[in-house]
């Protein structure tokens, strides 16, 4: 049986973060899928997590996202296509939807 992780002392105990009411979360299983995405898709996915409502939806325009991420609009569209292909995002203009992660099939 796996032991619970031991508590660690923070490096800077005066700056321990707390979760704000508007907290956005990322599924820890994304760690194992980042390599398949590329930097632009990772940036877009992170942005969409920050922008999403409680159902995972957001209405940000590609041009606005591009400006916020310092990307070209075409890069945002290509990143979106990659996220769709990986099953991480659904899109119907102008709505983005973050999808729940499914465990990979063996």
Q: Over which residues does each language-model region extend?
A:
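Short recognition helix of helix-turn-helix/winged-helix DNA-binding domains
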Residues: 1-56, 67
